[in-house]
Every structure is written in structure tokens, then in C-alpha cells.
């Protein structure tokens, strides 16, 4: 069987592959063993198909290529830049289409996967795949590509295994590896409480509150728990006062660190804005949320952070928070067409309103092909689009405008998603 696919895949998608990806596609995917969550490397040959079955049109980001699966529907995907190079590896979640960047390179992403797979809350993934004695440990592939010894990687993985998230992520951040997802984990650790680990819909029912709205709101910020319910929770769970303690200052610090380097992830804005509001820094909160509301809803990690208690009519957590502060919004926000589309809750759902907004923007005369591509992208992946016929048009426009902008790789990826959509429907 031919294990060498780098040249064919690079030509198929007009990719400028890095050395580590060339090594991976040229057989390393079939020579190393992985017992972490993402252990299905067998998809590589199928990427040459006209409409690969691993492509999920309308769900996966249209500039990503799935390359490693977890056999439960999630994928590690290459995210491709305008120049055809892989700019990062993202974990795409099939249960909603959310994504989180794992690292700039495949080596970083596989290292983080090894870490998360042994963490106490994630240990069940260790049973996904038995070790193959004929293949090498995946850490042996990662180590030389990150320029360190196996011992360095084993120390970091070991810290995750013992639940020492802060110490483990200290090591990652010192090396500049997996920086975004490390910050995500540090925020999660800062806001984690015994209550979050023990809460479930049955507990909400026992307290006489709704799970989706009220209980998740309390889990997001325990200061929102009414005093009488705190007393009941103490009785039921036997927890101390510390059972509700969160470190919002630490969470804010990590969110701001992410935002200093990138502005495309909704969860960082959500956390930074809420932390500011808690300190009565309303203008700062509004500024963070106005930037955050313009990111994709698929970047918000709302289930992990328990921020999904917002009113779905607004489409996003940040949108509802801004609406709560609507009397204080500056005129440039209050009069913005995008904001008007978000809050027009009497006109269809958020998906319909926002998709229509971006299609209207993309259809304006005089826009560059690159700007059109960006607007069509947001038409499909701002708050999502639920109409198959519209998605066919969106993907077609992404392919056309990507090609006109000279972004051949993005054009070919969009065309592949379009072919898969036509095959499925």
C-alpha cells in the first residue's frame, strides 16, 4: 500500500506543506501508535477523493481539512491560511460544530491531545485504542519536531495526568506551545468548583430551578447563586464555603493574554467582558463584548464555560450582555447595522437575520474578492446557517471569491465541501 501522500495532497488542495506535515502524510501516520483521544490516522488516503466522507459541509469551517479522527465524530483539522500554509490545528467538535485551536503545528496539537487524554476528567479516552507493539510511541514523533527530549514531554503529560493543570500549562506557555488551548484550560481551572463537578439536571430539579438557564448561570459565576440556594446546596452536597470559590482575576488575566495575540475567539471576549462587569467596569465590558459579538458563535466554548444560558434569540452570549446594557451603548454600536440585525428578535431567528446581513454585505458592488470571501464566510459561520440551499450558494461563493483573491487552497477546500454537500443532499 502506498503510504506517501504529501505531494498528491499538496497538489489536490494547493497546499504549501511544512516539513512535519510532509513527514506525516508520507507515512509517519502509519508508523506511530497513539492511544490518546485522536487515534484514527487512517483518513489520509481518502483526502484524495472528490468528496471525502470526513468533510462535514456546513459544520466544519470551510478553510479546514480534517486529518485525524477520534472515532466518535470529532476531528483534528488543518486550518489553512491565504497562502496555502497550515496556520494552526483545530479540534472540531461534531456535537455542535464548535472548535478550539490545539496548536500552530501538528506536533503541538498531538502533544496537547496526549495531555488532555490522560487528564482526570478525560481518562475514559485511554480505552479508545490499544497500543500496537509494532509501532512507535507518538511522543517519539513529537519530540524532535519540538526540539526537546522525550523526558520534557513526559513531564508535561504527567502533570496533566495528575490534574496539575496550572503547572502543566506553565510548561507549555514557557515553550510557546499550545498557547491558546493552554489559556483555555487555565481559565477553566480558575473557574472550576466542586459544584460544577457535581451539578446535573437532577440537582437542578431538586432545587426547583431550570438546568439550562438558572443552574448553568450559577455554574458560570457562583456569585449569582441566591443566598437561600447556597444554604440548600451546602446541605445537599456537604460542601464548604470554598465549594463556590472562583478566581475571576486569574480568568481575566488569561483571557486578556489570548486577546493580546488574536481576536477571533468568542470565549476570550466573553470571559474578559464578564470579569470587567464584575468590577463595575461597564465601559470596558461593553468594549470587550462588542468585539466578541463579531466572532463566530462556534468559537465560544459555551458548554465548557457554562455560558450557554443566554437567550438564543440573540445568537450569542455577548449579544445578550450588550442588550442588557443597551441604554449605555455608544451611538456607533447602537446604530451599527450588524447590531440592528442581532437584536431584531421579532424578525426570524438569529441565524436567518445574520446570514441575510452578511449576504447583503457580500453582494455590494465594489468589494474586493477577499472582502467578499470574508463576508460569505461569516454568512455561514457567524451564528450558523440552517438552510442547505443557502449553504450550497455560500460554499460556491467562497470557492469563486477565494480563487479570484488568489487564495487557491481556500477555493479548493470550499469546492470540496460543496461537492460533499451535493453528494449528501
Describe the predicted segments one by one.
Residues 88-131:
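Compact, glycine/acidic-enriched structural inserts
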Residues 1-85, 135-425:
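A surface-exposed partner-binding patch
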